[in-house]
Amino acid sequence: MIVPMSEQIDSTLVDVAVVGAGPAGAAAAIHAARAGYDTLLIDSSPFPRDKTCGDGLTPRALHQLDLLGVEVNATYRNRGLKLHGFGGTVTAPWPATYPSREGTALPRYEFDALLVAVARDAGARLLTGTATTPVLEGNRLVSFDVDKQRVTAQWVIVADGVRSTFGKQLGRTWHRDEVYGIAARAYAASPHDGEEWMHSHVELKDPDGVVQPGYGWIFPLGQHVNIGLGALSTATRPAHLNTKKALHFYAEQQRSEWGLGELRNVTSAMLPMGGAVSGVAGANWMLIGDAAACVNPLNGEGIDYGLETAAMAVEMLGTKDVTLAWPDRLHAEYGEAFLLARTAARLLTYPQFLPLAGPVAMRGPVGRMLMPAAARLMGNLITDEDRDLVARAWRLAGGAVSALRRDTPLWDA
């Protein structure tokens, strides 16, 4: 049979194909190209392009960027978090866990484009198009199509975000009986766009005055602010919240204090969290970052995990078969912490829990003790190098939760 010229597909053969050019995918392409692999980076949209995100870069994320040699030329810097709600305010500076005790924030349309440019400078090629039609032999990915290109790669790293449409075609399953997030985000002008603290409001109410299991945020960006909110949900206890409408209501509550202008670029998203997906690897392919639900269940933060899993995945290249090795690696790095965070987040989905626990946590000596630690957990800043009481409690509690909930979905093969 003769195939018409308009339907002919070109073939591309590479060592490593990376599907998705967000922070995780671009970082993977940087690592792979610098390691000497012929690397193809694929994204469905031309750059720059926007993504629903809080835009915050914690000291943990900045540490990963330092390891990559990527300099974020953001003039804005912040010192940590301020948490508000239930009649109290707690200030939580970034701890001295990483070399820098400063964070920053950069809109995703700038940050992603920066990382893609670094990947191209490292030698990765960029292809714009949608990855579809994977051809599998057993659990080995032989080839897939990107528009009229057929891509054959020795290794494939899938970093196509929270929806992970290509990951789904490979068998990725999202377990919505575990905690997931729903969120909305916008930008607004503010005379306080240089404020040196990121602000979170943990007493998030809907227009009817009902406390929701989530929080609102205002993250200064130096030229404007990122304002958003997120709520926690499960299949059995869904958050009955229209996030975009709730965001406008939240903005009205904060407008006077922050001098907020009109909201622009309002977007929303749903977030699988805490490793609550299965089917994250095959013989020669791995899901990383948001696609692998590497998202903190307490706040929806995922950039630092995306950067870390990118480096980890490239380290695994050359392994004979990563079907089990990759989820095992994710378990080892994040398993106990994610199980504990998912358990804590699940508590917040019970309507009666937050109104009772919130005032205790945010006021008085208990709040001064607990909430800086909670802020650190929300900033993904617990590591094995920590030696203080909170870090030890985190690891001990993580071990206990792990023992109690071993059957819970956590990157199951």
What are these regions (language model features)?
Residues V14-L40:
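N-terminal Rossmann-like FAD-binding beta1-loop-alpha1 element of flavoenzymes
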Residues A24, F47, R163:
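Conserved Rossmann-like nucleotide-cofactor binding loop
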Residues S233-M316, D321-A325:
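FAD/FMN-dependent oxidoreductases across multiple families
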